[in-house]
C-alpha cells in the first residue's frame, strides 16, 4: 500500500531545503526534520484534497468505512461524534438526546456541555466497577421505549477500560428499530477490525465509531480514526470533516499524520496473520494464569485484566511488584490490574510477563469488596454544572454538593460522579476507596 504522507515528508527531510516557515526548530534534528507544517504539497487535514486525502482513502479501504484522521486522539473524535449526532437531531426537529452507557470518558461530558445535549444514562443489570458498563439489548430497548422522546443516538464504550466488549451487534438492531444512531467509543479496539471474524463496531452495525490508533497499533500518541459506516446517513459523512475541525487545532502534527500513514502499510502487510498468532499466544498465557489461581476479567483479546485479590494482592500492589521487575502496567486500582499487549510485545515480552506473574508468592486472599456501584441523583444538566461558578473542596467535605467538573485523571478518565449530580454518602465512600482527594463542586 502506498504511503503518500510518509513519502512527501521523508522527501522533504532529504531535500536540504532552507526552511523559512514554521516550526521554529527549522528541521534541525532527527525527529524535527520530519515535523513540518502545511507547505505546498503537504495538503491540509481539514480541507484534504492531496496526500492526506489519499492516505485517508487507504485507511477507509482497510477499515471498510469512511475513515478520517485525528491527531488529537479519540477525545477529538468523541466530540465530533456528538456534534454529528446533534446535527442528526436537528434534522429530526428536536433537541438532541443521547442514551449513554454510564462509563463514559470525560471527553464525552465536555462535548455534552459544549453542545448542550441531553443525556439519558444507561445502567447494566449488574455492575461491579464504575469502569465497566456492559449492557444487553433488552436493557437498551427498555430505555429507548420509555424515553421522553426517541433518543437520537445510543453511545457505548467498547471495549471498555477493563477489556469488556459490548453486545454491539444486538444493540445495533435495537437502534435501527428506534431510528437512533449507534455511536461507539472504540478507543481501545482499533485492531478488532483485523481479527477473523472482525469484532470492529462498524462491522457489527455501529453508525459512527472512533479508534485510538495509538493505543493498540504502531502509531504515535494522538493518532486516531473517526469512522462513518457506509450504511449511516449521508449527512454524517458529508459533515465529518467540519465536525473534526470544530474541535481540532489548526496545527495538526505531521509526525502523527505520518505515523497514521505508515500504519496503513503495516496493516496491509500481513497484520491479520501476525495478530492471530499473537492473540493465540496471549490466550495461552491467560489460560496458564487462570490455572495458577489468577482471576481474569473481560473478553477483549489483547487486554489482560487481573483481579489479584484472590492471590492476596491489590491491583496497586501487584503493579508495584511488576514495576520492580521493570514491567510497567497500563492501570491499577485496588481491585484491577490492566495490561495492554500487542504483537509488538513479542514472544519474549510474553515470556517475561509470564515468568513474573507465575513467580509471584501467593498470599491469603483479600476479601475486602469494593463499594457497591450506585448512581447519584442528577439535579442539574451536565452543561449547567460545568459552566457554573465552582470551587475545589476536599472530597470528604463534599457531601451534599453538586459536582461541577469531572476531576478525574487519565487513565482512566471515567468519572465516579457525573457533573450535575449531588454527591451522597455512597459517593464519598467511593472517593475514599479510590483515593480521590479533592473534587470541584458548584457554588450554590
Language-model segments: residues:
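Conserved PLP-enzyme active-site core in the AAT-like
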Residues: 2-8, 72-295
Amino acid at each position: 500500500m502506498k504511503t503518500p504522507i510518509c513519502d512527501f515528508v521523508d522527501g522533504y527531510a532529504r531535500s536540504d531545503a532552507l526552511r523559512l516557515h514554521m516550526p521554529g526548530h527549522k528541521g534541525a534534528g532527527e525527529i524535527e526534520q520530519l515535523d513540518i507544517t502545511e507547505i505546498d504539497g503537504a495538503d491540509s487535514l481539514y480541507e484534504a484534497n492531496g496526500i492526506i486525502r489519499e492516505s485517508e482513502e487507504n485507511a477507509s479501504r482497510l477499515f471498510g468505512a469512511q475513515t478520517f484522521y485525528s491527531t488529537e486522539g479519540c477525545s477529538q473524535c468523541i466530540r465530533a461524534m456528538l456534534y454529528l449526532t446533534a446535527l442528526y437531531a436537528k434534522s429530526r426537529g428536536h433537541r438532541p438526546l443521547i442514551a449513554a452507557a454510564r462509563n463514559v470518558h470525560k471527553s464525552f461530558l465536555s462535548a455534552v456541555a459544549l453542545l448542550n445535549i441531553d443525556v439519558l444514562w444507561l445502567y447494566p443489570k449488574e455492575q461491579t466497577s464504575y469502569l465497566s458498563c456492559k449492557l444487553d439489548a433488552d436493557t437498551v430497548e427498555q430505555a429507548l421505549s420509555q424515553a421522553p422522546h426517541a433518543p437520537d443516538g445510543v453511545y457505548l464504550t467498547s471495549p471498555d477500560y477493563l477489556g469488556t466488549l459490548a453486545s454491539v451487534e444486538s444493540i445495533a438492531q435495537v437502534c435501527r428499530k428506534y431510528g437512533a444512531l449507534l455511536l461507539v467509543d472504540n478507543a481501545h479496539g482499533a485492531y478488532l477490525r483485523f481479527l477473523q471474524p472482525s469484532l470492529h463496531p462498524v462491522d457489527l452495525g455501529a453508525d459512527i465509531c472512533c479508534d485510538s490508533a495509538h493505543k493498540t497499533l504502531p502509531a504515535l500518541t494522538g493518532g486516531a480514526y473517526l469512522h462513518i459506516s457506509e450504511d449511516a446517513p449521508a449527512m454524517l459523512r458529508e459533515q465529518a470533516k467540519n465536525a473534526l475541525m470544530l474541535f481540532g487545532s489548526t496545527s495538526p502534527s505531521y509526525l502523527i499524520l505520518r505515523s497514521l500513514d505508515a500504519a496503513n502499510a503495516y496493516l496491509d502487510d500481513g497484520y491479520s496473520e501476525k495478530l492471530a498468532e499473537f492473540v493465540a499466544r496471549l490466550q495461552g498465557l491467560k489460560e496458564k494464569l487462570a490455572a495458577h489461581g489468577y482471576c481474569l476479567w473481560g473478553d477483549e483479546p489483547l487486554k489482560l485484566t487481573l483481579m489479584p485479590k484472590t492471590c492476596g494482592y491489590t491491583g496497586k500492589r501487584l503493579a508495584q511488584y511488576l514495576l520492580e521487575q521493570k514491567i510497567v502496567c497500563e492501570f491499577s486500582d485496588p481491585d484491577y490490574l490492566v495490561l495492554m499487549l500487542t504483537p509488538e510485545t513479542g514472544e519474549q515480552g510474553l515470556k517475561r510477563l509470564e515468568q513474573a506473574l507465575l513467580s509471584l508468592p501467593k498470599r491469603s486472599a483479600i476479601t475486602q469488596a469494593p463499594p457497591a456501584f450506585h448512581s447519584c441523583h442528577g439535579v442539574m444538566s451536565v452543561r449547567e454544572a460545568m459552566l457554573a461558578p465552582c470551587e475545589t473542596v476536599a472530597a470528604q467535605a463534599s457531601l451534599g454538593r453538586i459536582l461541577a467538573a469531572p476531576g478525574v485523571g487519565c487513565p482512566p478518565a471515567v468519572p465516579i460522579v457525573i457533573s450535575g449530580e449531588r454527591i451522597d454518602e455512597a459517593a464519598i465512600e467511593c472517593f475514599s476507596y479510590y483515593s480521590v482527594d479533592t473534587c470541584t463542586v458548584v457554588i450554590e
